């Protein structure tokens, strides 16, 4: 789903996830402000953990000891071209029935053990801002998921609740322009 920025992709994805108010979201302390902003705006509680000294990615050894009965998700960015240990994060999330959200703004097209960035998570975002791998002369972002209901909810959020126009249902969708 194309949106105006990677930040908007995070906000829309978090809103479309319908997490229960007061749920906890594990995230690294070293991240862009949007990661925290979308958690707080969705009335969730960020649980900060440290990052690895050499890769600046979420410290997978610290995740499990920070999981509580209120934890609903893990949100982690790949940072400065370094990809998180998504295999371990995914394994922990499955064990505890948590959603995994990847911010791949810095690593679109990157691979981990032959699998593309974004393959281990429930949904991912990327940004096309000028400082990222692929840019589009200013801004732009994308939300990627494999959940039809959630993508339909996200489309409604992107279009301020409109699902059709005076012409037809497809006339307002940016993908059809």
Model region roles, listed by residue range:
Residues 35, 89, 154:
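Aromatic/hydrophobic pocket-lining residues that form π-stacking "cages" and hydrophobic walls in ligand
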Residues 24, 45, 72-73, 97-99, ...:
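Proline-centered loop/turn at the N-terminus of a beta-strand
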Residues 37-39, 92, 133:
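Hydrophobic/aromatic ligand-binding patch that stacks against planar heteroaromatic rings
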Residues 107-113, 120-177:
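Active-site region of PLP-dependent enzymes
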Residues 60-75, 80-114, 147:
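Catalytic PLP-binding core of fold-type I/II PLP enzymes
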Residues 21, 27, 48, 100-102, ...:
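Hydrophobic residues in well-ordered beta-strands that form the structural core
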Residues 1-24, 38-41, 48-50, 115:
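Phosphate-binding glycine-rich loop
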